[in-house]
Amino acid sequence: METPLEKALTTMVTTFHKYSGREGSKLTLSRKELKELIKKELCLGEMKESSIDDLMKSLDKNSDQEIDFKEYSVFLTMLCMAYNDFFLEDNK
């Protein structure tokens, strides 16, 4: 039986691959694919084009104009840290 944490990890991996490869490599997210993933999978509200550009620049460590799985994982880690901070503040 899959534990809640294992299910969460599976969801993170399958979500990446659900959007990757629609344009170009199956192993990376293009700017358009990243934008669609954020819009459909996260409740971050409507993001400005400049915000998407800034996010791409900050995540794209190898400057290839695509987000690979490692870069995507860093993004998820940053989100987890922000969620944790929110819950810590909410419990004060």
Curated annotation (Swiss-Prot):
Record: residues binding Ca(2+) 1: 28, 33
Positions contributing to Ca(2+) 2 binding: 60, 62, 64, 66, 71
Disulfide topology: none
Gene3D superfamilies xref list: EF-hand
Record-level Gene Ontology MF annotations: calcium ion binding; calcium-dependent protein binding; copper ion binding; protein homodimerization activity; zinc ion binding
Ranges of residues in domain EF-hand: 12-47, 47-82
Keywords: Calcium, Copper, Metal-binding, Repeat, Zinc
GO cellular component terms, A-Z: neuronal cell body; nucleus
Role this protein plays: Binds calcium, zinc and copper. One subunit can simultaneously bind 2 calcium ions or 2 copper ions plus 1 zinc ion. Calcium and copper ions compete for the same binding sites.
Assembly and interaction partners: Homodimer.
Protein name: Protein S100-A5
